[in-house]
């Protein structure tokens, strides 16, 4: 999504980028069901600590995003649902890459 890319690009050039994690998740599978479950969706993680250029195929759910945010911020789970959610460890690395993000231009005429 062009708008999301531009937002991440701007934020990655800010002084806050070294301590930032951005999660982008669709609220539904947009075009509807296809040959796979319509309950699945995509989640994008942008951070100096995010693994760049990889597709993580680990099955997470929306509560996993919340659980990951709680762990990053060092706060306890709010309830049993986020306490039992799988944290998104596969999306991150211990070594930060502070290179700013560059949004791709639109290729739709």
Q: Can you annotate each of these PLM segments?
A:
Residues 1-109:
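N-terminal pro-sequences and low-complexity stem/linker regions of secreted or lumenal proteins
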């Amino acid at each position: 999504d062009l708008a999301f890319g531009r937002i991440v690009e701007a934020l990655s050039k800010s002084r806050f980028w070294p301590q930032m994690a951005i999660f982008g998740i669709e609220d539904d599978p947009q075009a509807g069901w296809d040959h796979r479950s319509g309950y699945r969706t995509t989640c994008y993680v942008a951070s100096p600590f995010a693994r760049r250029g990889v597709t993580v195929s680990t099955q997470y759910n929306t509560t996993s995003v919340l659980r990951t945010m709680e762990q990053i911020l060092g706060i306890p789970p709010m309830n049993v649902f986020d306490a039992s959610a799988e944290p998104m460890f596969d999306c991150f690395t211990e070594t930060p890459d502070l290179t700013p993000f560059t949004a791709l231009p639109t290729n739709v005429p």
